[in-house]
């Protein structure tokens, strides 16, 4: 694997199964080719009026607005520099963590990572692979309660990342045996991608 951007988004820190799975997966990546961003330990700003205004401004930016644009540019450059994104995406209340959504809101920028054309939206970040490690307390894969998979597939595709693999660690709150099997299944899937 060449250049890797690993995103951790769990609020559980050292107790996070998604973080552990991602950390185990990237342990053999050359450190010079690895960027790790812990979105919970180092939270990004929420998309509010001030952030949205900054990202749409074209001139005469205040110092605060320029800081938002600079942060967004840095996050986008991390994506562009990577060949593979490894995303820890635990399911919280049937969706992704706020921390991961904040990252998405800062990298999905019209005219920068996607553009509108007469034929629809065109993603501008191409040639990347994304591996999404999603952990869940219950069993949600291929069911109406799984909003993580379709959302991330759509939003990553929106910016041009269409080669997306999902790794599922499910049933983590359904007893020790079920949790152990869920982790083991995810580890086996990840081992085939290393």
From Swiss-Prot:
Cofactor binding mode and count: Binds 1 FMN per subunit.
Signal peptide segment: none
Keyword tags: Flavoprotein, FMN, NAD, Oxidoreductase
InterPro entries associated with the record: Flavodoxin_fold, Flavoprotein-like_sf, FMN-dep_NADH:Q_OxRdtase_AzoR1, NADH:quinone_OxRdtase_FMN_depd
Enzymatic reactions: 2 a quinone + NADH + H(+) = 2 a 1,4-benzosemiquinone + NAD(+); N,N-dimethyl-1,4-phenylenediamine + anthranilate + 2 NAD(+) = 2-(4-dimethylaminophenyl)diazenylbenzoate + 2 NADH + 2 H(+)
Key word Oxidoreductase present: yes
Protein name, as recorded: FMN-dependent NADH:quinone oxidoreductase
Gene3D superfamilies the UniProt entry points to: 3.40.50.360
Any one Gene Ontology molecular-function term assigned to this protein's record: FMN binding
Protein family (similarity comment): Belongs to the azoreductase type 1 family.
Binding site for FMN: 10, 16-18, 91-94, 135-138
Gene symbol of the encoding locus: azoR
Function: Quinone reductase that provides resistance to thiol-specific stress caused by electrophilic quinones. Also exhibits azoreductase activity. Catalyzes the reductive cleavage of the azo bond in aromatic azo compounds to the corresponding amines.
EC numbers: 1.6.5.-, 1.7.1.17
Cofactor(s) this protein cannot do without: FMN
Subunit structure: Homodimer.
């Amino acid at each position: 694997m060449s250049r890797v951007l690993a995103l951790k988004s769990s609020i559980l820190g050292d107790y996070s199964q998604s973080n552990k799975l991602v950390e185990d997966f990237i342990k053999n990546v050359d450190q010079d080719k690895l960027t790790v961003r812990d979105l919970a330990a180092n939270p990004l700003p929420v998309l509010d009026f001030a952030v949205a205004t900054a990202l749409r401004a074209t001139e005469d930016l205040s110092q605060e607005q320029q800081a938002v644009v600079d942060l967004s540019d840095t996050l986008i450059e991390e994506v562009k520099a990577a060949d593979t994104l490894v995303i820890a995406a635990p399911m919280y209340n049937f969706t992704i963590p706020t921390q991961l959504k904040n990252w998405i809101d800062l990298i999905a920028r019209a005219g920068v990572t996607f553009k509108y054309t007469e034929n629809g939206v065109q993603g501008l970040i191409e040639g990347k692979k994304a591996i999404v490690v999603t952990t869940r307390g219950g069993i949600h894969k291929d069911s109406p309660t799984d909003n993580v998979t379709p959302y991330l597939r759509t939003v990553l595709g929106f910016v041009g990342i269409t080669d997306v693999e999902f790794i599922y660690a499910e049933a983590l709150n359904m007893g020790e045996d079920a949790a152990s099997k869920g982790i083991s299944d995810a580890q086996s899937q990840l081992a085939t991608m290393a």
